[in-house]
């Protein structure tokens, strides 16, 4: 059941003196876009009558087929709390439709919706809790972003050592004003690195929340004279930023990954889900780790995963099963980074896990030792493979995985791979 009707939104805009409404959507690479309308055009927007030029968005369509429609999702209506004065600004997240009023296959939100529908056909709801890390860097005298900070704080440090504490508090309060349930916030391992964790939700809401989270963090950081960076590895010699995703499936409101009688308290479905993720992980990596820079993070020595293995007892493998059981039982995938498109990340994770359940893919035994300390021969004996080592290898792995390509659809697969090949070629040409 929808939270808001069209009349609800029109009334809230009038009552709250909202002047501008951002019709937001996300491009193929996870960049937030918007068409802004004034309140006088709101009813037209809510009737799905707002158009934009899709050929201007990278990865969408050619100029000869450029007319596209924005279909607002009423339940995503939200008033931005950082502009409370006269003439407030609100937003609605939109789906993209073609000129003939069909869902656009290149819309990342549509890709996730399809995956969620596949899960629903099997009786499952896909719940996800992300762990979003970011850096707060200084701006230079011209107000341009840098990768510099005078801060030297570390894991769980507090002010006055933590120079970003006040900004982080404001981010938390702002996010709560926008309807987030913030579970924790703290300084991370590296200087100027932070994490804010919000409560899990069903997958589409979580992906929407990640996009909103990044916008709010960047906006509040700028108000504090800082630059919020979601780059996976902005500096050499320190831990990069990840976006771990904690995943579970529910059926009739019950977490089906939990089984008190099962091995490690896990159900067969949980093991099969892990098996599916491991089977398709190489093909998914260019989605979960989309930049040349992403692979600067995925190196030994900085707590980021490299090897395709799982464990319930240590954090060195790719997949971890946190200790909580019962309703909190979940599978944590540790490789995604915050530069990734959350809609595509959650879509490929869900469909890989569902493939594991459908085909009862049993994962290899859990790894109890530190994978980084194993010799090459020991890893080979255990069948432990590595993630792609760079963007070029990741592109090649997706090209080989027909299942993941089908999840993404022909349009996104073609345009995404084309763009990533160009990124790699540009990187190789740099001197």
Model regions and ranges:
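Glycine-rich, acidic/polar active-site loops that bind/position phosphate-bearing ligands
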Residues: 1-431
């Amino acid at each position: 059941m929808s939270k808001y009707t069209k009349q609800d939104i029109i009334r809230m805009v009038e009552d709250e003196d909202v002047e501008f409404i951002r019709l937001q959507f996300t491009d193929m690479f996870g960049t937030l876009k918007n068409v802004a309308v004034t309140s006088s055009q709101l009813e037209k927007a809510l009737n799905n009558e707002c158009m934009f030029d899709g050929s201007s968005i990278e990865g969408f369509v050619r100029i000869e087929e450029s007319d596209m429609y924005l279909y607002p999702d009423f339940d995503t209506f939200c008033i931005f709390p950082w502009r409370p004065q006269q003439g407030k600004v609100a937003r609605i997240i939109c789906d993209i439709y073609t000129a003939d009023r069909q869902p656009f296959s290149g819309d990342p939100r549509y890709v996730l919706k399809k995956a969620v529908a596949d899960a629903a056909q099997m009786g499952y709801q896909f719940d996800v809790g992300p762990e979003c890390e970011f850096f707060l860097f200084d701006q230079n005298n011209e107000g341009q972003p840098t990768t510099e900070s005078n801060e030297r704080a570390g894991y769980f440090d507090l002010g006055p050592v933590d120079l970003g504490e006040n900004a982080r508090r404001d981010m938390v309060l702002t996010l709560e004003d926008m309807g987030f349930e913030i579970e924790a916030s703290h300084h991370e391992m590296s200087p100027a690195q932070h994490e804010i964790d919000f409560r899990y939700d069903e997958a589409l809401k979580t992906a929407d929340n990640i996009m909103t989270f990044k916008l709010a963090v960047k906006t509040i950081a700028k108000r504090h004279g800082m630059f919020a960076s979601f780059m996976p590895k902005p500096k050499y010699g320190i831990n990069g930023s990840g976006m771990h995703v904690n995943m579970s499936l529910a059926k009739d409101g019950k977490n089906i990954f939990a089984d008190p009688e099962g091995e490690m308290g896990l159900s067969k479905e949980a093991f099969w889900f892990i098996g599916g993720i491991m089977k398709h992980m190489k093909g998914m990596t260019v989605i979960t780790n989309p930049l040349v820079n992403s692979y600067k993070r995925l190196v030994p020595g900085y707590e980021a995963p490299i090897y395709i293995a799982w464990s319930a007892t240590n954090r060195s493998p790719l997949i971890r099963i946190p200790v909580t059981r019962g309703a909190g039982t979940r599978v944590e995938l540790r490789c995604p980074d915050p530069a990734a498109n959350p809609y595509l990340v959650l879509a490929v994770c869900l469909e890989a896990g569902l493939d594991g359940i459908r085909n009862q893919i049993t994962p290899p035994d859990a790894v109890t030792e530190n994978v980084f300390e194993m010799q090459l021969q020991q890893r080979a004996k255990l069948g432990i493979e590595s993630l792609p080592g760079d963007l070029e290898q990741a592109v090649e792995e997706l090209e080989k995985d027909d299942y993941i390509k089908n999840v993404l659809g022909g349009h996104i697969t073609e345009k995404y791979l084309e763009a990533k090949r160009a990124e790699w070629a540009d990187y190789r040409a740099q001197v």
